[in-house]
From Swiss-Prot:
Keyword RNA-binding annotated: yes
Protein name: Leader peptide SpeFL
Binding site for L-ornithine: R35
Summary of the function given for this chain in its UniProt record: A small protein (arrest peptide) encoded upstream of inducible ornithine carboxylase gene (speF) that controls expression of downstream genes (usually speF and potE) by transcriptional and translational attenuation.
Residue ranges of the motif Ornithine recognition loop: 32-38
């Protein structure tokens, strides 16, 4: 989760810099980030807690 947050912030920062130098392409890039934010950070658009979801999907200690 933290890695995804880091990637999203990194891309967002790059998009803001791009927006400063090229407003038209920068706006479309920011719109793309807004549309795909739920992939990188599921808690943004979901009603359940991502941490709860992650805790349910932890590998068990039992051998297969």
């Amino acid at each position: 989760m933290l890695f995804r947050t880091y990637i999203h912030r990194y891309v967002h920062t790059k998009a803001l810099r791009f927006l400063r130098f090229n407003p038209i392409k920068g706006r479309s890039l920011m719109a793309h980030i807004r549309r795909t934010r739920h992939i990188m950070m599921p808690s943004y658009r979901s009603c359940f807690s991502y941490s709860l979801f992650a805790s349910q999907n932890k590998p068990s200690n039992r051998a297969l």
